[in-house]
């Protein structure tokens, strides 16, 4: 890469078809706002200068873009895509390199595809346009090429002849050119059209009028899927999940029922991991080799170390860390807690704000009582400790190495190493009580029945 690169991300659309109080480009695909996808793509393709163009109706976009480290430019009023790109000119620090126009509502374009667009410029094209061939070209603008395969013009559907409408190669909107040339051409774009707008696509015709070469780079249709509605959002999510499932399996992950497993944008899973059906991964998950995630589990912000097991019906929340060979079983929730090597939490348990030592065993129904209504408090369970079923651990509290808690104990004080904690009412027996109770109840029922 010999020339510097910049990226202009168009994010000023109103997105009314989403029917949402949330701005369209802040809706998420795979747990990540679409704007974040675009900014990450710009960075991945080597853009050192990124400008996000936002609209006056959506200051939340400006705030989000600035939080992501991009410059911002306001398009007000909105007068088309060409006008939006022009709005970014003052915010760009350097016009000496190449610039690419990306869209914040097109989240699935890969860095490899964008690299091919820049390669077209490096190969001698003055303008490079990203096109695709959808199953149904519908009303997309057609990319008309010449005999050499270069782009001759972009024809909007409403202006296309029958022969041009038969062309299957259409415009994605993504366009790259040397920045200085791009803005020079945009300065010549007029708005003599039904909408009175300035169209970025006119740049191609203006470049050809100067006898400059324009190239087409073809992408898969799934990559350039634009999101304008909830249905489009669902389609983008499905496309991402399909891509991720194939990638995971190609990298050595077993998915028993791939179509039922859902990943986040940043899920990291090592080889020889087995994922059973109906598992959902939120952001921030790292899974090491030989882990098994059983069916119907939900995992977010968690780290599962080598050989750990989770589920079925496990919920691992942010900050959960499962040590090597540890086990979290059915109907167990772990939050902001660390399980050391070989620890077992097999069923019906909540562990929050805690550390569980190596080879400790947590019995069914155990609860760490970590919240007093104002603050969270920590529970520490030592190595080889045994927590009896139905134990309540009232934090802050420590159970020492090798200590036991008796079933049903409410632990409110630290338990020394190798001690037994027992805190429950002594069991007493009342001889004959059950017979007397049953006789009284039956007599009462008989009297009531006789009165009806």
From Swiss-Prot:
Pathway(s): Nucleotide-sugar biosynthesis; UDP-N-acetyl-alpha-D-glucosamine biosynthesis; N-acetyl-alpha-D-glucosamine 1-phosphate from alpha-D-glucosamine 6-phosphate (route II): step 2/2; Nucleotide-sugar biosynthesis; UDP-N-acetyl-alpha-D-glucosamine biosynthesis; UDP-N-acetyl-alpha-D-glucosamine from N-acetyl-alpha-D-glucosamine 1-phosphate: step 1/1; Bacterial outer membrane biogenesis; LPS lipid A biosynthesis
Primary subcellular site in the record, as a coarse category: cytoplasm
Molecular function GO labels: glucosamine-1-phosphate N-acetyltransferase activity; magnesium ion binding; UDP-N-acetylglucosamine diphosphorylase activity
The record's free-text note on cofactor binding: Binds 1 Mg(2+) ion per subunit.
Residues at the active site: 347
Enzyme class: transferase
Annotated region described as Pyrophosphorylase, given as residue ranges: 1-230
EC number annotated for this UniProt entry: 2.7.7.23, 2.3.1.157
Keyword rRNA processing found: no
Annotated Pfam families: Hexapep, Hexapep_2, NTP_transf_3
Positions bound to acetyl-CoA: 364, 370-371, 389, 407, 424
Spans annotated as N-acetyltransferase: 252-452
Reaction(s) catalysed (UniProt annotation): alpha-D-glucosamine 1-phosphate + acetyl-CoA = N-acetyl-alpha-D-glucosamine 1-phosphate + CoA + H(+); N-acetyl-alpha-D-glucosamine 1-phosphate + UTP + H(+) = UDP-N-acetyl-alpha-D-glucosamine + diphosphate
GO biological process: cell morphogenesis; cell wall organization; lipid A biosynthetic process; peptidoglycan biosynthetic process; regulation of cell shape; UDP-N-acetylglucosamine biosynthetic process
Keywords: Acyltransferase, Cell shape, Cell wall biogenesis/degradation, Cytoplasm, Magnesium, Metal-binding, Multifunctional enzyme, Nucleotidyltransferase, Peptidoglycan synthesis, Repeat, Transferase
Needed co-factor(s): Mg(2+)
Subunit structure: Homotrimer.
Function: Catalyzes the last two sequential reactions in the de novo biosynthetic pathway for UDP-N-acetylglucosamine (UDP-GlcNAc). The C-terminal domain catalyzes the transfer of acetyl group from acetyl coenzyme A to glucosamine-1-phosphate (GlcN-1-P) to produce N-acetylglucosamine-1-phosphate (GlcNAc-1-P), which is converted into UDP-GlcNAc by the transfer of uridine 5-monophosphate (from uridine 5-triphosphate), a reaction catalyzed by the N-terminal domain.
Name of the protein this chain belongs to: Bifunctional protein GlmU
Lineage, opening ranks: Bacteria, Pseudomonadati, Pseudomonadota, Alphaproteobacteria, Maricaulales
Gene name of the encoded protein: glmU
């Amino acid at each position: 890469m010999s020339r510097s690169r910049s990226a202009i991300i168009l994010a000023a659309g109103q997105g009314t078809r989403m029917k949402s109080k949330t701005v369209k480009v802040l809706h998420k695909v795979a747990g990540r706002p679409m704007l974040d996808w675009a900014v990450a793509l710009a960075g991945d393709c080597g853009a050192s200068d990124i400008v996000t163009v936002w609209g006056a109706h959506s200051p939340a976009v400006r705030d989000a873009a600035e939080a992501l480290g991009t410059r911002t430019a306001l398009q007000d009023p909105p007068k088309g895509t060409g006008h939006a790109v022009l709005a970014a000119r003052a915010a760009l620090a350097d016009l000496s390199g190449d610039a690419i126009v990306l869209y914040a509502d097109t989240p699935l374009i890969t860095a490899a595809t964008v690299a091919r667009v820049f390669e077209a410029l490096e190969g001698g094209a003055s303008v490079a346009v990203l096109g695709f061939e959808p199953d149904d070209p519908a009303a997309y603008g057609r990319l008309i090429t010449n005999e050499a395969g270069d782009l001759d013009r972009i024809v909007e559907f409403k202006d296309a002849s029958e022969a041009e409408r038969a062309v299957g190669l259409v415009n994605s909107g993504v366009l790259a050119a040397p920045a200085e040339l791009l803005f020079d051409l945009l300065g010549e774009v007029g708005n003599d059209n039904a909408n009175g707008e300035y169209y970025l696509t006119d740049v191609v015709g203006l470049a050809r009028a100067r006898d400059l070469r324009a190239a087409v780079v073809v992408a898969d249709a799934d990559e350039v899927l634009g999101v304008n509605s909830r249905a489009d959002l669902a389609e983008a999510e499905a496309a991402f999940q399909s891509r991720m499932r194939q990638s995971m399996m190609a990298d050595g992950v077993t998915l028993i029922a791939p179509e039922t497993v859902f990943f986040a944008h940043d899920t990291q899973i090592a080889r020889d991991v087995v994922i059973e059906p109906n598992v959902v991964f939120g952001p921030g998950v790292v899974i090491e080799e030989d882990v098994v995630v059983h069916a119907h589990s939900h995992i977010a912000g968690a780290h599962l170390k080598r050989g750990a097991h989770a589920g079925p019906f496990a919920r691992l929340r942010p900050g959960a860390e499962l040590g090597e060979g540890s086990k979290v079983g059915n109907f167990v929730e772990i939050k902001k807690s660390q399980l050391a090597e070989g620890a077992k939490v097999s069923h019906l348990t909540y562990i929050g704000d805690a550390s569980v030592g190596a080879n400790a065993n947590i019995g069914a129904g155990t609860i760490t009582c970590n919240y007093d209504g104002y603050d969270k408090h920590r529970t520490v369970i030592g190595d080889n400790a045994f927590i009896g079923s139905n134990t309540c651990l009232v934090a802050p509290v420590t159970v020492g190495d090798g200590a036991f808690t008796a079933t049903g104990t409410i632990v409110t004080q630290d338990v020394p190493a190798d001690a037994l904690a027992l805190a429950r009412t002594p069991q007493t027996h009342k001889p004959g009580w059950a017979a007397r109770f049953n006789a009284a109840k039956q007599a009462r029922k008989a009297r009531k029945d006789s009165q009806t």
